């Protein structure tokens, strides 16, 4: 199975699901996404199309699809579970490039209280446009009605069914899984498809819950850098200094010297936050993630931490691209969507040798942290 994800945390989430099921999984991102794709049961291609313009997202979708092997037997499009992104444009481009006759778009995640009922999207029984997703800087939720959010979807062959339970999802797969339909959506749909299409393909032992917990690289208060770069971010009380982005930078100033991060030099740990939500739009979003990424690079130039934790897909992509970190090995799934990856990167600071192994933990902004910050984590 090949998966194309529209942001890096979504890609990591899907890779983590496949990993936890014991599947051989490859995760590629950035410019490497169109290089030779490793022959694995599941290959996840991370893109940043959600943060691109619609025209750029269409071009990137065509580019990636054109590099897929003719032997690709199954393609899944990972989309956001909160209706964000250039969904119709990207699905249309993928159908044109691959020959799929129609698409089933199912962003519902019933396991997380995210359902579609009578054509409306709810999060824990609250219409999505009444949640914090209405503050998203690029794709603010203005309606909970899918046909209003994507008015041209059905005309382009994109089906948007209801789903209130995981059983509903399994029934939809049984109805549409004919080899002519491109499935697109969130993690619950992928998990169900994985079981249907590859349930008998793996012949080893799936990792147990306890082994996954033991793999958790917990949070040390002495060598950890945490980026809270999502409008869904919640405050963290970890005994680590917090450095909020100043209002001047948030409002458009690009002078990073205004951002006081002096505590990092003392204990080599820090939490960077964005405490404001009043700016929306593409320009604001690009500025905010760029500032977060540049400040992170500045800090890592001072000291390369053992653990980098990033909340928010756009922030994660911008940061890892700015750092030049593009190749990772998945080492643990802490909770749904909370995935840890290992990277061995060149180290140019005075505090480490020529290379250093860094654990990178990624999490979508709206997902819970699981037991990452639990006292039982291996620190």
Predicted regions: what they are:
Residues 316-372:
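Conserved, well-ordered active-site substructure
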Residues 299-327:
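Active-site beta-strand/loop microenvironment that shapes enzyme catalytic pockets
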Residues 228-300:
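A glycine- and small/hydrophobic-rich beta-loop-beta segment
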Residues 7-10, 79-88, 110-112, 165-167, ...:
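Gly/Ser/Thr-rich loops at beta-strand to alpha-helix junctions
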Residues 3-5, 26-28, 75-78, 102-107, ...:
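General beta-strand structural signal in soluble alpha/beta enzymes
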Residues 120-203, 209, 213-214, 219-260:
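Conserved, well-structured core segments that form the ligand-binding/active-site neighborhood
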Residues 20-42, 255-266, 330-352:
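N-terminal short beta-loop-beta anion/metal-coordinating cradle
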């Amino acid at each position: 199975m090949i998966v194309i994800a529209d942001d890096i945390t979504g890609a990591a989430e899907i890779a983590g699901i496949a990993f936890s099921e014991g599947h051989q999984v490859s995760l590629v991102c950035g410019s490497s996404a169109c290089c030779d794709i490793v022959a694995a049961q599941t290959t996840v291609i991370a893109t940043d199309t959600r943060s691109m313009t619609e025209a750029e997202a269409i071009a990137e979708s065509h580019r990636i699809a054109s590099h897929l092997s003719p032997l690709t037997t199954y393609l899944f499009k990972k989309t956001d579970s909160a209706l964000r992104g250039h969904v119709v444009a990207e699905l249309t481009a993928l159908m044109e490039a691959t020959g799929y006759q129609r698409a089933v778009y199912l962003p519902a995640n019933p396991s997380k209280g995210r359902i579609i009922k009578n054509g409306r999207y709810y999060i824990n029984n609250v219409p999505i446009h009444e949640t914090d997703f209405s503050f998203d800087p690029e794709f603010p939720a203005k309606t909970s009605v899918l046909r209003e959010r994507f008015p041209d979807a059905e005309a382009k062959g994109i089906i948007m069914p209801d789903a209130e339970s995981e059983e509903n999802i399994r029934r939809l797969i049984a109805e549409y899984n004919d080899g002519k339909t491109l499935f697109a959506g969130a993690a619950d749909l992928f998990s169900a498809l994985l079981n249907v299409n590859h349930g008998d393909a793996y012949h080893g032992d799936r990792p147990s819950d306890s082994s996954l917990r033991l793999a958790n690289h917990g949070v040390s208060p002495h060598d950890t850098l945490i980026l809270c770069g999502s409008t869904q971010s919640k405050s963290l009380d970890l005994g680590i200094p917090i450095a909020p982005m100043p209002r001047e930078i948030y409002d458009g100033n690009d002078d990073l010297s205004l951002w006081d991060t002096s505590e990092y030099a003392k204990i080599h740990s820090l939490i960077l936050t964005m405490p404001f939500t009043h700016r929306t739009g593409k320009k604001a979003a690009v500025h905010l993630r760029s500032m977060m990424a540049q400040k992170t690079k500045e800090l890592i130039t001072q000291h390369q931490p053992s653990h980098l934790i990033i909340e928010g897909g756009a922030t994660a992509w911008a940061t890892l691209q700015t750092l030049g970190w593009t190749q990772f090995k998945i080492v643990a799934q802490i909770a749904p969507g909370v995935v840890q990856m290992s990277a061995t990167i060149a180290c140019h600071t005075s505090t480490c040798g020529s290379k250093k192994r860094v654990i990178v933990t990624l999490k979508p902004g709206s997902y819970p942290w699981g037991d990452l910050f639990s006292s039982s984590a291996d620190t």
